[in-house]
Design a protein with these regions (language model features):
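Acetyl-CoA-dependent GNAT
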Residues: 10-11, 18-94, 99, 104, ...
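Conserved GNAT acetyl-CoA-binding A-motif
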Residues: 124-137
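C-terminal "cap" of GNAT-fold acetyltransferases
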Residues: 135-139, 149, 156-178
Length: 178
């Protein structure tokens, strides 16, 4: 398995052919006044061909605008990826946005998300970020992943980065070696 930063030449129309976005969501966190409560839900998150085409264009746009796509490959198949924007923001320009981190269904719960996250952190540090900003989908599994790796509630909230009304705004403090 290889994890690498993608270049424009790595992006092609068939790159998501084997990527399986399928996810059954049975519980999500919802904000109730000042607390988060777990609620039962029932829906499927998946990508059709149009959504995959959209994602490929999104990858190209990201790279062209100075951001990064980190891809994980099994042989030649893209099985996981993350997207970080290329510009700093926040009151002290301390944040960089991690706007996507997805693992193909067959490869989840095997440590791949954590491995990609480590690479994301290294790349964010190279861009002089102090923290990752994550507007996370509120699915129980997604929040459990981010909390397990050390994410905390975001100290600053950026409404323009919230994709869905129930997203949980998180941050991760990056570690700089001395």
């Amino acid at each position: 398995m290889e994890i690498k930063q993608l270049k424009i030449s790595d992006i092609h129309p068939n790159m998501l052919n084997y990527f399986n976005r399928y996810q059954e969501v049975t519980q999500c966190w919802r904000r109730n006044e000042n607390n988060w409560v777990l609620e039962d839900v029932s829906y499927i998150r998946d990508w059709d061909e149009n959504k995959k085409k959209w994602a490929i264009n999104y990858f190209l746009q990201c790279i062209e605008q100075g951001g990064m796509i980190i891809g994980a490959f099994d042989e030649y198949n893209l099985i996981g990826f993350a997207k970080i924007d290329g510009k700093l923001f926040g009151s002290l320009n301390q944040y960089i946005n991690l706007s996507l981190l997805l693992i193909s269904n067959e490869y989840r719960h095997k440590g791949l998300g954590s491995r990609i996250f480590v690479t994301v952190c290294e790349k964010a540090i190279s861009l002089n970020a102090k923290k990752l900003y994550i507007s996370a989908h509120s699915a129980k599994d997604a929040i459990a992943f981010y909390k397990k790796i050390g994410c905390k509630d975001a100290q600053e909230i950026f409404q323009e980065l919230i994709d869905e009304p129930n997203d949980w705004e998180l941050e991760y403090e990056l570690c700089y070696s001395r």
